[in-house]
Structure formats: C-alpha cells, structure tokens
Amino acid sequence: MPKSLIPFLIVFVFLFFGCARNNMPSDHQMLENFNLNESEFERLRNISVKYDRFYYPPYDETDSTAYIISYKDKKELDSLIKKLDIMSIQYDGISEVYLLFHTWGISVSGGYKEYIYAPNLEDKIENYNKEVALDPTTEMYIVERITEEDLDQVSQRYSVSIELYRPIKNGWYIHLSREN
C-alpha cells in the first residue's frame, strides 16, 4: 500500500466512526424508564430545586456547585444518576429541570434527548406560535412543538433546528433538540 494512502485511511476511519450515530433511545424506552422510576425522577427534581441555578455533576473539584451541595444530596444524586443512566442535571433557577439522557453530533451541529420538568412549557410554546404568526420565516430556522407523536419520526420531517417535546405527565416531557 502506498504511504500516501495511509493518512487518507486514518482520516476516513476517524470520520466513519466519529460520524456514526449512536443508538439514540426511543421515546418508548424513555417513557418506560420514566414510568418504572417515576419516584426517582421526582427525587432528582426535588433535590435540584433546593439549589439556585443548579447543575450536576460539577465540572471539577473547584466548581462552586461542588461546594454548595450537601454530602447527603451528593450521595443520593450520584446513586440516582447511575440508576437512571442520566448524564447530567440542570436547574434553571425558576422552574425547569433538565435531565440529559443522550447526546450526538459534533461541536457545530448535533443534538440531545433529555427528560425535562417544565410546568410552563405550554406557555413558552404559545409565545413561540405567536412569534411565528407575526413572522412565518421563523420556522425556516427553528421549529418548536409539543406533540404526542414519536419525536424521532417528527424530527425527520424538518431540516432545520428543532425543539420537540412529548408529554409524559404532570409537567414532565421528553425533549429532543437538534441544531443544524
């Protein structure tokens, strides 16, 4: 094999494996996980809202989040994150709690799928719909929807950035976000 082909093959292998899509969990799998572990999800939410603008795990030992969490809560968070296979938790300081479950893509484009507790989400989507009514070109850049349909299937209808939400119950949703 000519030596000039080696760099090409190395780049090809990295691109092939780096761009391969991970197995994103289906809505059905995520709904089943939530229904089997609802009390644990609620416990994660309850711990998160105790701390202002909270995220976990902390970025490193010097991160202020590492210092504000009680030892008891930290131990419980670690246990729940492991049990539920959650990557990270974030609380916006107002009402929304985000539990990151799966990510894909590269730094300039990609997406994620998460559980979100958002009791005011319908108001947020209503405001988005008003914005679209005033300027229909908004949907050329981003689409935001609440739907009972499978989020993976709905996402295939759009080639723009999307924020899709599927209701679970009591303010909980599955959230699929994709940035193009």
Spans of model-derived segments:
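Residue-level signal for the start and early helices of compact helical domains
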Residues: P7-I10, P25, E32, I68, ...
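Generic low-complexity segments that are intrinsically disordered, proline-rich and/or Lys/Arg-biased
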Residues: K3, F8, S26, P58-Y59, ...
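Sec-dependent bacterial lipoprotein signal peptides
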Residues: M1-F17
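Hydrophobic transmembrane signal anchors and adjacent membrane-proximal interface regions, especially
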Residues: K3, V49, A66-I69, M140-R145, ...
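Extracytoplasmic electrostatic interaction patches
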Residues: L84-N180
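N-terminal export/targeting and maturation segments
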Residues: C19-Y91
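Hydrophobic alpha-helical segments, principally membrane-spanning helices and signal/leader peptides
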Residues: K3, N22, V154-Q156
